[in-house]
Amino acid sequence: MEQLSYQSKLICSDESRHTGCFTTLPIRIHPRDDLADAASRRFVQDWAREMRDGREQSTHFSFSPVGNWSSLIYPEAIPERLGVLAYLSDLGLIHDDGGEGLSIEDAQAEHGELCAALDPSDISSAAPGSRAMKTKKLVSQCMLECISLDRELGLKMLAAFRDVWLAISERNSDKEAQTMEEYLKYRSDNGGMLVFWPMLQFSLGMSISEAEEALVQPIIDAATEGLLLANDYFSWEREYRELQSGQSKRIVSAVDLFIRTKGLSIDDAKEEVKRKIIAAERDFCQRRDDLYTNHPNIPLKLKRWIDCAGLAVSGNHYWCSACPRQNAWKDMSSQSLNGAKRKTSHGATIGMHEAPFKKRKDSSFFGSQPSDDEPSLSEVSSYPFYKPSGLALEAPSKYVSDMPSKGVRSTLIEALNTWLHVPSERLDSIMSVINTLHNASLILDDLEDNSPLRRGYPATHILFGHSQSINTANFMFVRAVQEVAQNLSPNALVALLEELKGLYLGQSWDLYWKHNLACPSEAEYVNMIDHKTGGMFRMLLRIMQAESDVTPQPDFHRLTLLFGRFFQIRDDYMNFQDYTAQKGLCEDLDEGKFSYPVVYCLENHPEYRGYFLSMFRQRPTIATVNACPLSGESKQYLTACLKKSGAFNKTIACLTDMERDLEFEINRLEQQTGETNPMLRLCLAKLSVKGIGRIGEVSPSTSK
């Protein structure tokens, strides 16, 4: 029978007992404890540099005389992943400490800031210099490392950190549990256990199916109980003293539960918790053995998962018994040792508003009867001038702005501001202008393409009509220009107007090719992208540069050029992927659009030209004609032609090359500015084609 092997070092029981540790499970420590300590030191330094709130001076981090917390709870972690786990763990510790000293409302607000920062898809804007922006910058590099190491498990871990722990950790925190079952349920949420297990999976590079999770869940439940209660046992004195001194506003502990519900003294309550810990470890072993007996052929992977869960229980227990975080109260002199300086581990329908008044039919406009020799004013002549309601004008704009968004442009603005340092008031105006122009372009694009859907919702012109949509889009352009003229510099206005001309120029060729069924060359298509899609990215950059006081400014031209091309060609490719359910299956084919895969196919394989042009010729090209998509069979055939021509492989290869060029360009700018930009790297990572699903094989029929 294949046996489990270990990279970690076994801690002998005689050594562990010196700290007051009483776990019944074997303890192991990662052989690269130095990596965990280095990551913890980096976190403390990053927090001090970015947050500037001094909180790192009063927080005890993962360091301990017996080893770093992450080295003890993830002893079998892949070495390359240990550092990022330690970094996230210390983020959790300092966040937990801060929350204990806050009211529930303030703690929930701080949870919200960290939740947004840990969301790769978050598009909310934060003012430069705000705590929310500092938090986002602090965690961006860590998130990028997680995704780079293991995209699937990294995103799963970050989602659990954000959506499971932060979203619910302060829920019901004003309610006192009355039973151990209630308490463990609350502590599992508040104590971060729902994120710990995805972190353990990430540490091992181990994906576990839902069926496998269900099979081992009783064992994991026992492990969870052991983890939580060990923390309660060893942290009681610290938390009780912090509550008594006013440093903390509340205490959540099994010791407190037994004091409240059973009337026990503190010593007896702690002894009861100790018995519960030993019982939980015994249950863990019994449930594990029962599973192995009932499932003799259980995969070695699950045995390793269960074994590492047990090692996490014992490692956490050992660390809690020795770490300054839980034991500094024993020696007040250790309070001067913060996480940065403390000795590290031994391993080193809409109507207008009514008029301002209703004219009475028995009076004239001036309120007196007209004389016989004066001409009488007609009612129409007497109506006053007033400004009508803007509801009809604003409704299409509000509709499209409320749709889900990738938020790439807002994220890019925040990332570029790492280098340009535009003041927050002007940055808010820039974001508002870019969002207004982008939404206006979406309204016009859908109308000009006769597209019925936008992000899974009816396109604006379907709901409000063509004319009203055009009118609103035009108004949005006017409003954007007005905002720049009022709030930003003359150079920003010049940049806006010049790039708007480019946007219209690029769109003109996209429309020309569709209307005339003329397929452009690859070079012509890329040039169109540079003006249409790239123009928006170039616009936001040029406006930011006009508002920045940084001198000299780096050359961002190639960055925005590549970003526009990458963004559009990726969108062309993804239109054939499953995300198209939001806009319609292969909607680019319905629109008769010469996207990048089609351009490559027709330019390099003219034998397919007749098929595509014949299909495109059948589509309605007049905006007043209802959109009529190609049949599913037609789209399958054309997709198969693209597949056979190698268009999809070429598109992926093109995107891969551009992604590499973008990474090189970011490196160049970081070296030139002397400032790393994890937010920009994360923005690119969210759009990465690394590991992206390839479009499946579809065989075209040979019949005509």
Swiss-Prot record:
Mg(2+) 2 binds at residue 96. Keywords: Isoprene biosynthesis, Lyase, Magnesium, Metal-binding, Multifunctional enzyme, Repeat, Transferase. Isopentenyl diphosphate binds at residues 406, 409, 438, 455. A motif (NSE/DTE) lies at residues 231-239. It catalyses: isopentenyl diphosphate + (2E,6E)-farnesyl diphosphate = (2E,6E,10E)-geranylgeranyl diphosphate + diphosphate; isopentenyl diphosphate + (2E,6E,10E)-geranylgeranyl diphosphate = (2E,6E,10E,14E)-geranylfarnesyl diphosphate + diphosphate. Mg(2+) 3 binds at residues 445, 449. It comes from the Eukaryota. A motif (DDXXD 2) lies at residues 445-449. This is Preterpestacin I synthase tpcA.
